[in-house]
C-alpha cells in the first residue's frame, strides 16, 4: 500500500486523514496525470461526500479537465457513465461498506476498471511533489451535470431477461443503491418491497451485508413469503442475498452459484477469485468444467486477472462481483438482476445451494494500527512454521497456509486499521481450534510489538 491509497483507493476517517485539502490534491494530481479529456464523478450518501466531491472537482477543473458530475450515484453507475460519456476516467466518493465516519476516493480508468497500484503510485508521486498542472483562466475545465440512471437501467434490461415475475425485498442500507436498484427490479417485472431505502448518510444498519446485519431482511422475506432478498452496501458495489426461506446465503455459496451460472450462460472458461476464497468454489467449478484462478484481494486485482486470462467471471467472497461481459467495475446492482435471472432459469436459491460443497468458514477482525501492520506480518511469517504444520503456502496477498482439509489466511486490511484472519475447515471443531490458535498468535504478536 502507498501513503494514501490502499486496496480500494483512499479510505480514511473524514476530517482526520481524509480532508477537503487532500481531496483537492487528488483532483489536481489526477488532472495533471491525465493532461486532457473528461472525468465522470459521483458520490454515495455519506454526510461528507458532497464536500469531498466538490473539492476533487475543483482540482480537476484547475488543471483544465472537463468534469461530468452525476451526483448521488452507486459506484457501478459511475463505471457505466465513464463509457457512456466517453470519459478518460471516473471518480467515486465512497467508503463502500465502512462505518459512516469514513469516506474515500476511488479512481477508475476509461474501461471502468479501478486504477491499478502503479497508476495510484503515479498520483501519489504528483501529490507529494506538489507539481500540479494549473491552466490559465481561459482554459479552466467545464462542469456539467448529468443523470445516466435511465440509460443504465435500460442497458441492464437489454442484458437480463426474466420469463417470470418475483417478489423481491431490497435492503439498500440507506446507500446510493436505493436510487437505482428498486427501480431496476420493478422494470424487470418484479414486485418490490424496500427496506432502508432512504438515501441518508446516517445508516440504520451495519453497511457490510452479512447475516448479522441483515436480520430484518431475513424476517421480511420470510413474513412476506418473498422469492428473494437483496442487500447492498453503501455504494452498491456488493450484493448480499437472502433465499426464499428467509436465510442469508453465505458469500462462499453465492460466489460458487453465480460463477457456475456464468459458465452456463457464457461458456466454459476461467473464474477469477481472491486468496480469501475457499475450497467450495474450486470443487463446484471443477465439476462444471471451469478453472479457478486466484489473485490478491481487491476488485482491481480481480479485474486485472480477468483481462489477462479472458475470464468469464470474477468475484470475491464479500459479495463483490465483476461480470466482464458487462463492465470491469464491480456491480452489485447488475449482479442482483443476474441472480434473479439465475432463479428464473434454474430454480430457487435454497435448492440450488444444496449442490455447493459445504465447509466451515470463520472470519475474525483484530484491531491493529496501520503503522504496525508490516511488522506484525513479518513476525507472523517467522512464527507460522513453528505454530502450524501445513503443506502449501501462498504469499501473493498476506500469508495463506493450506492442507487438504483446511486453510488459514493472515492478512492486513487495506481499508481499516485491523488484521484479518480467514479460515476454512472440513469440520466445525477443526475450524474453531484453528481460529483460536491463529487468533492467539496474531494478538500476542501485536501485543509484543506494541509494548
Curated annotation (Swiss-Prot):
The lineage of its organism: Archaea, Methanobacteriati, Methanobacteriota, Thermococci, Thermococcales. Belongs to the phosphohexose mutase family. Mg(2+) binds at residues 96, 233, 235, 237. The keyword Metal-binding applies. Binds 1 Mg(2+) ion per subunit. Disulfide bonds: none annotated. The modification Phosphoserine is found at residue 96. One of its GO terms (molecular function) is magnesium ion binding. This is Probable phosphoglucosamine mutase. The active site is at residue 96. It catalyses: alpha-D-glucosamine 1-phosphate = D-glucosamine 6-phosphate. InterPro entries: A-D-PHexomutase_a/b/a-I, A-D-PHexomutase_a/b/a-I/II/III, A-D-PHexomutase_a/b/a-II, A-D-PHexomutase_a/b/a-III, A-D-PHexomutase_C, A-D-PHexomutase_C_sf, A-D-PHexomutase_CS, Alpha-D-phosphohexomutase_SF. It comes from Pyrococcus horikoshii (strain ATCC 700860 / DSM 12428 / JCM 9974 / NBRC 100139 / OT-3). Keywords: Isomerase, Magnesium, Metal-binding, Phosphoprotein.
Amino acid at each position: 500500500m502507498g501513503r494514501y491509497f490502499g486496496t480500494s483507493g483512499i479510505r480514511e476517517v473524514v476530517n482526520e486523514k481524509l480532508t477537503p485539502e487532500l481531496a483537492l490534491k487528488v483532483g489536481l494530481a489526477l488532472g495533471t496525470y491525465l493532461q486532457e479529456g473528461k472525468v465522470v464523478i459521483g458520490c454515495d450518501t455519506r454526510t461528507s461526500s458532497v464536500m469531498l466531491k466538490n473539492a476533487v472537482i475543483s482540482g480537476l477543473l484547475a488543471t483544465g479537465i472537463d468534469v461530468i458530475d452525476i451526483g448521488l450515484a452507486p459506484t457501478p453507475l459511475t463505471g457505466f457513465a465513464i463509457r457512456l460519456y466517453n470519459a478518460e476516467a471516473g471518480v467515486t466518493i465512497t467508503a463502500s461498506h465502512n462505518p459512516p465516519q469514513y469516506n474515500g476516493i476511488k479512481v477508475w480508468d476509461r474501461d471502468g476498471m479501478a486504477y491499478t497500484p502503479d497508476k495510484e503510485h503515479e498520483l501519489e508521486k504528483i501529490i507529494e511533489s506538489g507539481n500540479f498542472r494549473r491552466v490559465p483562466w481561459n482554459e479552466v475545465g467545464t462542469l456539467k451535470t448529468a443523470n445516466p440512471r435511465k440509460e443504465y437501467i435500460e442497458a441492464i434490461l437489454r442484458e437480463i431477461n426474466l420469463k417470470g415475475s418475483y417478489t423481491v425485498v431490497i435492503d439498500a442500507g440507506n446507500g446510493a443503491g436505493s436510487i437505482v436498484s428498486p427501480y431496476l427490479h420493478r422494470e424487470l417485472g418484479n414486485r418490490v418491497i424496500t427496506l432502508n431505502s432512504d438515501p441518508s448518510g446516517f445508516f440504520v444498519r451495519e453497511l457490510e451485508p452479512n447475516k448479522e446485519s441483515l436480520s430484518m431482511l431475513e424476517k421480511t422475506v420470510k413474513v412476506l413469503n418473498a422469492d428473494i432478498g437483496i442487500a447492498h452496501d453503501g455504494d452498491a458495489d456488493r450484493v448480499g442475498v437472502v433465499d426464499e426461506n428467509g436465510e442469508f446465503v453465505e458469500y462462499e455459496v453465492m460466489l460458487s452459484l453465480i460463477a457456475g451460472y456464468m459458465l452456463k450462460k457464457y461458456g466454459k472458461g476461467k473464474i477469477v477469485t481472491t486468496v480469501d476464497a475457499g475450497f467450495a468454489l474450486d470443487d463446484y467449478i471443477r465439476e462444471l468444467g471451469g478453472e479457478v484462478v486466484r489473485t490478491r484481494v481487491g476488485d482491481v486485482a480481480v479485474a486485472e486477472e480477468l483481462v489477462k486470462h479472458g475470464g468469464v467471471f470474477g468475484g470475491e467472497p464479500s459479495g463483490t462481483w465483476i461480470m466482464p461481459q458487462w463492465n470491469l467495475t464491480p456491480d452489485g446492482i447488475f449482479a442482483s438482476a443476474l441472480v434473479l435471472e439465475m432463479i428464473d432459469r434454474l430454480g430457487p436459491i435454497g435448492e440450488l445451494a444444496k449442490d455447493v460443497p459445504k465447509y466451515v468458514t470463520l472470519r475474525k477482525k483484530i484491531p491493529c494500527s496501520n503503522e504496525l501492520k508490516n511488522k506484525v506480518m513479518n513476525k507472523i511469517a517467522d512464527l507460522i512454521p513453528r505454530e502450524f504444520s501445513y503443506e502449501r503456502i501462498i504469499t501473493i496477498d498476506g500469508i495463506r497456509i493450506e492442507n487438504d482439509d483446511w486453510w488459514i489466511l493472515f492478512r492486513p486490511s487495506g481499508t481499516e486499521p485491523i488484521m484479518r484472519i480467514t479460515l476454512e475447515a472440513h469440520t466445525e471443531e477443526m475450524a474453531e481450534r484453528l481460529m483460536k490458535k491463529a487468533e492467539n498468535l496474531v494478538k500476542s504478536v501485536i501485543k509484543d510489538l506494541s509494548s
